[in-house]
Amino acid sequence: FSFEFILSVTGILLILGLVFASSQLDKTGQHIWVQTIFLVLIRLYIFLFSVMSKLGTLGIILDNGWEAPSRSVIKTRGSRKMKGLFVLTLLFLLAQSGMAVFDLATLEVNDQIKLVAHRGYVAKGVENSLEALEAAAKEKASYVEMDILLTKDNQFVVMHDYNLKRLAGIDKKVQDMNFDEVVGLPIKQGEFTSRIPSFEEFVQRAKELDMKLLVELKPHGKEPDNYAELFINEMRRLGVATEYKTMSLDLSIMEEIESKAPEIQTGYVIPLQFGNFSLSNVDFFVIEDFSFNDSLVIQAQSEGKEVFVWTINDPDLISKYLYKSIAAIISDRPDIIEREKQYEEKDNSYFDKLYRLIYN
């Protein structure tokens, strides 16, 4: 324990000294050779720390009763081992140098990432309301994610919950009410008030704001057999089939829409993903932070699909995902994402680089 503690403290001091020296030599943080040496030395320390820790553990085991090799055996084998160790160290440094150049060249903010405001900008209005839509547009979100339910008379309204009690104070389900009974009902969330809009009304306002929508279908189980066709027809009637994206927890509905209306971009929302993605006829996957790993992005891209991540609100997590090859970040805080993006593009000190390399 004391050995690793001393090694850790020494390493921290060395890393801080390296960061300081690199910052003095390259104040802009853009000199490729200084960056390469910086990264190689950091990785070399991590490698040596791992080796020394294992050697320390081995030493404790030997002290507790293992019989060490004789002095003559050690002497005859020593020179060959030292040569081999030298060659391996040299190869390691060369490999790390190449990897460092590659990492530094690719460790850039992904400027293609779409910012998706989750149910609008909910810090400025009731979720899924026109006010939340308008607030998200002011924050220059790429898309607004919103939820739609089918009423008893087979029309679409904008609402997340199956039951209206949480927002409207009415203990009734949307599936048991007609369109005219739902649209216009007052809703309240925190200090904000609004009313339930129809899907068409929401789309028309989004068009006025030049805001694209990510439409989540929320099937409640009592939809007619032609549910997918009802949605497709509505998207086409409103003239947004090729502009908007849609997603759902129900894979079968998404695959039906993909089959019947390939012009509509479809996504499968996966609450918890273990292992690789299963074979799915959709255009993108939507996963939460816990399930995310880089191999999933590689798999999706190899299949010509995209990956969206939800719901990312923590600034550190937002910063992390800005460097990933994902298509979109879904967040309740579009204001934070834009701020973090500007910060990451601007700040390139060696402390920033060290943090990104460790955290990403």
Regions found by a protein language model. Name each.
Residues 112-116, 143, 212-214, 243-246, ...:
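Structural preference for beta-strand elements that scaffold enzyme active sites
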Residues 125-135, 199-202, 226-228, 268-278, ...:
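Short, acidic/polar
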Residues 267-360:
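C-terminal active-site rim and adjoining tail of enzyme catalytic domains
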Residues 3-98:
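Juxtamembrane transition segments at transmembrane-helix termini in multipass membrane proteins
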Residues 103-152:
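Membrane-interface segments at or immediately adjacent to transmembrane helices
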Residues 160-265, 287, 301-303, 357-359:
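Metal-dependent phosphodiesterase/phospholipase catalytic core, i.e.
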Residues 68-124, 170, 180-194, 353, ...:
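Long, acidic (Asp/Glu-rich), low-complexity accessory segments flanking structured domains
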Residues 118, 136, 147, 182, ...:
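Conserved, mostly hydrophobic/aromatic
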